[in-house]
Swiss-Prot record:
Exhibits robust catalytic activity from 37 to 55 degrees Celsius. GO terms for molecular function: dioxygenase activity; metal ion binding. This is Trivalent organoarsenical cleaving enzyme. Fe(2+) binds at Q5, H62, E114. It comes from Thermomonospora curvata (strain ATCC 19995 / DSM 43183 / JCM 3096 / KCTC 9072 / NBRC 15933 / NCIMB 10081 / Henssen B9). The lineage of its organism: Bacteria, Bacillati, Actinomycetota, Actinomycetes, Streptosporangiales. Organoarsenicals are used as herbicides, pesticides, antimicrobial growth promoters, and chemical warfare agents. Arsenic is the most widespread environmental toxin and is classified as a Group 1 human carcinogen. InterPro entries: Cadmium-induced_rsp, Glyas_Bleomycin-R_OHBP_Dase, Glyas_Fos-R_dOase_dom, VOC, YqcK/CadI-like.
Amino acid sequence: MSRVQLALRVPDLEASIGFYSKLFGTGPAKVRPGYANFAIAEPPLKLVLIEGAGEDATRLDHLGVEVEDSAQVGHAARRLKESGLATVEENDTACCYAVQDKVWVTGPGGEPWEVYVVKGDADTLAKADDSACCTPRDSGSAGAAVGADCC
C-alpha cells in the first residue's frame, strides 16, 4: 500500500499530537524528541510532525509518497529522471528516526517531494552529513529545495 505523506513543522509538538489524535481518531505510531508520526489508515496518510524552533505557526515542511519497498523507490527514481526532473537519491539514510531509501524532487513552487521506503528504526532525527534530509533551506543553491528540511 502506498500513501501520501504530509510533514508539518509545528510550534507545539504536544498540542499538535493531541489535535491530530482527535482529528484522525488515532494516536501517533512513533513519538521521539521533537518528532511524531501518524500512520493513518483512512484516509491513507503518513502525517509527520516536526517541532519547529521558535516558530509561531505551523508550516509545510515537505511532501512525500511512502511506498512498500526499495524497488518501488528505484522505479520512481528512474521514471522521474526519464521525465526530465532533477533527482537526489539516498540509500540507507538515517532521517526522522528511520532508515530509509528515497528519491527527492522539487515542485515548481519550491516544494520538496520524496518517494521513500522505511527500512527500519534509527536513533536520530537528524540526517547523516551526506543526506538531503533535515537540511535547512538555502535559497542560494540550485538544489536547495530538494530534500530541503526533513522527513
